[in-house]
Structures are given as C-alpha cells and as structure tokens.
C-alpha cells in the first residue's frame, strides 16, 4: 500500500489545544449536528463502500472495490476497523420544524417597537425555511438516515494508518470528517 499523502501526528501532540482555530470551530459544528459515530468491521462495509463511491465521483478517480476493502478487513482482522458517521435527517427535520414553530410563535408575540428582535426572528424564520426544504429533499433522496463519511483504519504496533477515507459531498456542511478522521 503506497499512500499518496503521509501525515504523522504523535499522540502526545494530539488534542484540542493543538488544533487551529478553524479546526476547533469545525469540530464544534460537527458535534452540534448530532452525528452518530459507529466503529465496526464488515457490518459497516456496505455504507463505507457507498461513501467511497461518492469520493470517486467527486474527484473523478477510481479507487478500490468493496471486495478489496473486505480483503483488507480479513487480512488485518482485529487490527483493522471502519469508522462511519451517520446523519439522522428525519430527526433533524423534526427538530428544525419545532424551532420554526417556536420562531413563528415568537414573531406573532413580538411587539411592534422591538424592531431588532423582529428582524432577527425574520432572518431565523427564513433560515429555518431553507433548512426544512433541504432536509425534506434529503429525506426523499437518501431516506431517514444517511452515512456521510467514513474511514478504514489499520493498527500496526503503536501506530495506526487511515488507509481510505471518503465522504458524501452533499453533507460536507456537517463537518463529519472532523469526528471520524
């Protein structure tokens, strides 16, 4: 296996304190999305292959087949694992609709002379309407839950290598890779 890029990060140097401001911000964004992080083996192979296909399409390249990933998992057995991040679209849609209803209620009860508050609520209303529309479209396309990104990692001694990593471009705004990589 010959990686195109090789990055070394020592465990002692790894942590939130050593991340850039943007890295910390993106981790916080990802944590707010309530992504479901799962670790596993062959049981996650189907979804891992799907995110790798998304990466192939996005980059216009050809990577490996599902059978190859399965062979890696078999070969390295307990020293290989898959990490996936799932986004529960339906749950987020429900939560966003509840926030939208509260926003409408607050707008109805907002006094005429509270112009700043009314303006803020109007902007929030517009933002929530866009999110609801996007989530409804995503539910139609992907179903209630979608795998947004994943990695295939191999442990070797005191180190580990992420051999393959992929993501679904439609959900890049969730910053899922910050929780799986």
Spell out what each predicted region is:
Residues 1-172:
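A conserved beta-strand-loop-helix scaffold within acyl/acetyltransferase catalytic domains
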Residues 172-181:
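Conserved acetyl-CoA-binding loop-helix of GNAT-fold acetyltransferases
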């Amino acid at each position: 296996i010959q990686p195109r890029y090789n990055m070394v990060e020592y465990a002692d140097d790894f942590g939130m304190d050593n991340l850039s401001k943007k890295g910390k911000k993106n981790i916080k964004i990802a944590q707010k999305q309530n992504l479901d992080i799962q670790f596993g083996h062959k049981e996650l192979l189907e979804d891992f292959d799907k995110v790798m296909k998304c990466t192939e399409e996005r980059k216009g390249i050809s990577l490996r087949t599902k059978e190859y990933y399965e062979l890696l998992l078999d070969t390295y057995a307990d020293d290989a694992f898959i990490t996936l991040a799932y986004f529960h679209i339906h749950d987020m849609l429900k939560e966003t609709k509840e926030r939208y209803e509260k926003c409408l209620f607050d707008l109805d009860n907002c006094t005429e002379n509270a112009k700043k508050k009314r303006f803020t609520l109007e902007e929030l209303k517009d933002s929530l309407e866009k999110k609801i529309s996007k989530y409804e479209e995503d539910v139609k396309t992907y179903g209630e839950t979608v795998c947004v990104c994943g990695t295939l990692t191999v442990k070797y001694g005191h180190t580990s290598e992420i051999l393959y990593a992929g993501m679904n471009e439609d959900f890049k705004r969730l910053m899922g890779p910050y929780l799986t990589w």
